[in-house]
């Protein structure tokens, strides 16, 4: 059904055509073959990242198909550019409606945009938005403010798909003269290189263990990590 030779990257598998009708039992089996030398250290074996079963309408948001960029930042507002890929797996064209709502770090609604969507049969359509955010709170190493882009795809009164994407509003730049700048301020990267394991917990990625790892790195003066 699906073969993936690299354990560090995410991948997806469409199992629609293999599923039994509603009411019947479906069994998902994963076989791991770990043969030969694959690393200079023990990299673990088996399923050591999260696995999700995703159910969508034939007309849906593309997995990993949302991009949020900060185009411009002033004292008064920030301008966001958001692109969303919509897939249509039907044999006929489809019409839908998309609404993007921006939620501030404080949980307040700070922006809403809406567009109609028309996707060809078995096609993909990229929908582009430009949204202003007044008095934006910028993301930085010391103040990691995170906004959310809530994307809702619907047809009539039926919700086809929805997703919430966390993101930070910030500007970055590089130059030979001034180096790396975050939000127009010079920032020296103090990086660490870590393997993906969590010591005695093994290679499995546990949410709290990953957060603790970052907390320890930051407490020791690091502001960049290579995993």
Predicted regions and their residues:
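Beta-strand-rich binding/interaction modules
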Residues: 77-118, 125-129
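Active-site-adjacent substrate/metal-binding segments within catalytic domains
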Residues: 1-5, 58-71, 81, 136, ...
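Conserved, mostly hydrophobic/aromatic
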Residues: 51, 84, 147, 184
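Short acidic/polar inter-strand loop motif in beta-rich domains
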Residues: 33-39, 154-160, 184
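Short glycine/proline/serine/threonine-rich loop/turn segments at secondary-structure transition edges
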Residues: 19-25, 39, 93, 133-148
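Hydrophobic beta-strand positions in extracellular immunoglobulin-like domains
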Residues: 32, 53, 84-86, 102, ...
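Exposed aromatic-hydrophobic patches
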Residues: 10-17, 124-132
């Amino acid at each position: 059904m699906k073969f993936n030779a690299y354990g560090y990257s995410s991948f997806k598998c469409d199992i629609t055509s293999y599923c039994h009708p509603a009411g019947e039992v479906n069994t998902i089996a994963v076989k791991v073959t770990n043969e030969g030398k694959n690393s200079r250290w023990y990299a673990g074996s088996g399923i050591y990242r999260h696995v999700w079963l995703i159910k969508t309408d034939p007309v849906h948001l593309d997995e990993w198909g949302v991009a949020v960029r900060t185009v411009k930042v002033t004292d008064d507002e920030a301008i966001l550019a958001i692109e969303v890929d919509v897939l249509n797996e039907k044999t006929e064209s489809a019409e839908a409606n998309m609404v993007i709502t921006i939620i501030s770090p404080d949980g307040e609604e700070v922006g809403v945009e809406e567009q109609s969507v028309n996707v060809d049969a078995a096609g993909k359509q990229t929908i582009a938005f430009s949204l202003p955010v007044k008095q934006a709170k910028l993301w930085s190493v010391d103040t990691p403010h995170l906004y959310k882009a809530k994307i809702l795809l619907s047809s009539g009164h039926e919700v086809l798909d929805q997703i919430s994407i966390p993101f930070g509003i910030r500007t970055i730049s590089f130059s030979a003269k001034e180096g790396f700048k975050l939000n127009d301020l010079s920032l020296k990267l103090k990086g660490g290189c870590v393997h993906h394991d969590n010591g005695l917990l093994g290679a499995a990625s546990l949410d709290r263990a990953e957060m603790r790892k970052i907390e320890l790195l930051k407490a020791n003066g690091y502001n960049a990590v290579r995993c």
